[in-house]
UniProtKB/Swiss-Prot annotation:
Lineage, broadest ranks: Eukaryota, Viridiplantae, Streptophyta, Embryophyta, Tracheophyta
The keyword Hydrolase is annotated on this UniProt entry: no
Membrane-spanning parts: none
Keywords: Secreted, Signal
Tissue: Expressed in flowers and seedlings. Detected at the base of pedicel, in the floral abscission zone and in vascular tissues.
Keyword Transport: no
Protein name: Protein IDA-LIKE 3
Miscellaneous comment in the UniProt entry for this protein: IDL3 is only partially redundant with IDA.
Basic and acidic residues biased stretches: 46-58
Gene Ontology cellular-component terms listed: apoplast
Organism: Arabidopsis thaliana (Mouse-ear cress)
Composition-biased stretches (Polar residues): 36-45
Signal peptide: 1-32
Gene coding for it: IDL3
One record GO biological process: floral organ abscission
Subcellular location: Secreted, Extracellular space
Amino acid sequence: MSSRSHRSRKYQLTRTIPILVLLLVLLSCCNGARTTNVFNTSSPPKQKDVVSPPHDHVHHQVQDHKSVQFLGSLPRQFPVPTSGPSRKHNEIGLSSTKT
């Protein structure tokens, strides 16, 4: 019976590993960012935003703008409030110092 479970486990591994490898290869083609960004106020790069690499080859230019795509699975971003105590916390602090 142990040889049967060993064969079954080996069969599962021979099916699972190629599927995982295929999944990793397909996901590695993505760039890892969303298409919509609430905080991104900059426009797409213009010709002056193109950064040349250290060597003198003109045809090898790198754009300083992130390509945005990751299967659309990242959560939408929402504005983060500014840091600091709220009014409620200020009232608690002031009332405790008065007495």
